[in-house]
UniProtKB/Swiss-Prot annotation:
Region of interest called Disordered, as start-end residue ranges on this chain: 1-32
Keyword annotations from UniProtKB, A to Z: Acyltransferase, Endoplasmic reticulum, Lipoprotein, Membrane, Palmitate, Transferase, Transmembrane, Transmembrane helix
Origin superkingdom: Eukaryota
Predominant place of localization: endoplasmic reticulum
Domain notes from UniProt: The DHHC domain is required for palmitoyltransferase activity.
TM stretches of this protein: 88-108, 122-142, 230-250, 263-283
InterPro entries: Palmitoyltrfase_DHHC, PFA4/ZDH16/20/ERF2-like
GO-annotated molecular function: protein-cysteine S-palmitoyltransferase activity
Protein name: Palmitoyltransferase ERF2
Catalysis: reaction(s): L-cysteinyl-[protein] + hexadecanoyl-CoA = S-hexadecanoyl-L-cysteinyl-[protein] + CoA
Record topological domains on the Lumenal side: 109-121, 251-262
Length: 367
């Protein structure tokens, strides 16, 4: 195998033309303009960073360059992110999270706290799990899922658009589990040999470490760095719905009739309907983690067109299985977050090849 890892400061000579173009672009981007024109634009770009020219800035952060080679939109100086050109269903989920707690705070909390005996612990637990749910929602949908850097393994070729044939092969490595090798594939978009369990997300246009799935409802991938937050979001949303429903039931019983507590009845109906989707999804992921599988691996292993109704079982050749259901759950649910490989809030160095978008290569090497 001809594997050649290239550091950002020392790219291969075959891409010298692209490097010159990028360097000249960086030089033009660093030209200073009058401060009276630049401060407002810098503030706006700090608040929202999208894939657009930034010629008014004298220094860049990595997240500003990352927006050019991925589909990410960054907020608050690279602290939060989402994916561009999607349906933005996460906004709907956010409204569905905030609306019931606002109604509960305005119409229910005061009455329960003052007039219903024994309701105070229920109110406290309701707010606690809602806060946990909201924090998990932000941590899952607006943080780094485990984005891998680009252009780490570039081929030694004289043609800019071709790769050697072995780069299209699958490498098998031994594992502790018999007859279950670890498979590695090369990503022709990101130009890297992907680590085990990593996969390229077409929506985010990035390779994600320990890729589970891309969640349309959260508008982000679920990977190694936010998997625990995703599971916490599912369980806390179920628990917050249970306690909200309990509080409203106490209010309704104390009021005596639905007409005396219409908001309580509305919230009870809302919780009774909305609790099922996160509950079923939480149970589904419990079974997946118990068998040491990600959603991506499970869907690839299922032969049926209806994977929802397919029985979740231990895969025949899983190099990551431990033999214990509890240990499998612990390893996936409590796995280390890992490193931020791109250091998105650090200063951007001109010519850093992790932030290049190279052409898609041809299928065969030059002969």
């Amino acid at each position: 195998m001809r594997l050649h890892s290239r550091q950002a400061s020392n790219p291969h000579r075959q891409y010298s033309a692209a490097q010159s173009l990028h360097s000249s672009s960086d030089d033009s981007e660093h030209k200073e303009i009058p401060s009276t024109m630049g401060w407002a634009k810098r503030l706006m770009r700090w608040m929202v960073t999208v894939d657009q020219p930034h010629t008014f800035e004298t220094s860049l952060k990595n997240y500003q360059s990352l927006a050019h080679v991925t589909n990410y939109i960054f907020f608050c100086g690279g602290r939060l992110r989402t994916v561009a050109k999607t349906k933005y269903l996460s906004v709907l989920v956010l409204v569905m999270l905030i609306a019931p707690i606002v109604l509960f705070s305005v119409f229910e909390t005061g009455y329960l706290w003052k007039h219903v005996a024994g309701a105070k612990p229920c109110v406290v637990l309701c707010y606690y799990f809602w806060t946990l749910c909201f924090a998990s929602f932000i941590s899952t949908g607006a943080t780094d899922p485990g984005t891998l850097p680009r252009n780490i393994h570039l081929a030694q070729l004289q043609d800019d658009y071709k790769l050697p044939l072995e780069y299209y092969s699958i490498i098998t490595l031994p594992s502790p589990v018999a007859n279950a090798p670890v498979r590695l594939k090369y990503c022709t978009t990101c130009r890297i040999w992907r680590p085990p369990r990593a996969s390229h997300c077409a929506v985010c246009d990035s390779c994600i470490l320990s890729f589970d799935h891309h969640c349309d409802w959260l508008n982000n991938c679920i990977g190694q760095r936010n998997h625990r937050y995703f599971l916490a979001f599912l369980f806390s949303s179920v628990l917050s719905s249970i306690w909200l429903l309990t509080c409203c039931a106490l209010k309704l019983r104390h009021a005596g009739s639905p007409s005396a507590a219409p908001v309580s009845l509305l919230l009870i109906c809302y919780c009774a309907v909305s609790i099922w989707y996160p509950l079923l999804l939480a149970i589904y992921h419990l079974f997946l983690t118990g068998t040491q599988q990600t959603t991506h691996e499970y869907l690839k292993a299922v032969d049926s067109r209806n994977p929802i109704f397919h029985k979740v079982t231990h895969p025949e050749r899983n190099p990551f299985v431990t033999g214990s259901c509890a240990r499998n759950m612990l390893l996936l649910m409590c796995q280390p977050r890992g490193y931020d490989f791109l250091h998105t809030r650090s200063e951007h160095q001109a010519g850093d090849w992790r932030f290049f978008r190279l052409p898609i290569p041809h299928s065969f090497e030059k002969v």
